């Protein structure tokens, strides 16, 4: 268990950009400060997607929303990049197929020695363009992507890159192959 690393100031360095991230961060700090990390398993799921999400409405995954948008409109709208490090559509996310999320969760639930905080993702950042092209190919449609300005209200909070470090769950013996966007 990687508890000793978390006892250091490592957790102090993070600056969450939204309330959800802040609540996760505060829980992690509390668990660390109370000496609970070796007795709990905390899971941080990265962009989970999969079938049958329609009932979640606006809370469904971005993958589900993009699929519906392309299916209904034959095109997809993406935010322009507002930083020089990323071109339009090159913003990145770690997309995790729901079947992988379930397998990872069950693995940790069944592993009596697991303890601490785990990132659950595929461990590989993919671009919004990768996502768009995978969906267009699945629907057998020619790509039609429109870029629009990102609303001012979210520009300073927008994450241009997320990628789960899944080395910790791999160290517990989890060795399953993970779905790629193109295969899920």
Residues covered by each model-derived region:
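Catalytic helix-loop patch of NAD(P)-dependent Rossmann-fold dehydrogenases
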Residues: 1-49, 53-54, 58
């Amino acid at each position: 268990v990687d508890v000793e690393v978390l006892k250091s100031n490592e957790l102090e360095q993070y600056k969450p950009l939204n309330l959800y991230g802040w609540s996760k961060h505060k829980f992690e700090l509390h668990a660390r400060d109370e000496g609970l990390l070796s007795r709990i398993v905390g899971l941080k799921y990265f962009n989970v997607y999969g079938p049958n999400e329609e009932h979640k409405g606006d809370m469904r995954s971005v993958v589900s929303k993009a699929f519906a948008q392309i299916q209904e409109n034959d095109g997809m709208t993406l935010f322009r990049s507002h930083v020089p490090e990323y071109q339009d559509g090159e913003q990145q996310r770690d997309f995790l197929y729901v079947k992988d999320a379930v397998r990872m969760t069950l693995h940790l639930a069944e592993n009596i020695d697991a303890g601490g905080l785990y990132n659950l993702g595929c461990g590989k950042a993919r671009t919004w363009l990768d996502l768009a092209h995978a969906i267009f190919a699945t629907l057998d449609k020619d790509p039609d992507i429109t870029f629009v300005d990102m609303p001012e209200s979210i520009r300073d909070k927008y994450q241009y890159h997320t990628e789960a470090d899944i080395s910790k769950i791999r160290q517990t013996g989890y060795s399953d192959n993970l779905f790629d966007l193109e295969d899920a």
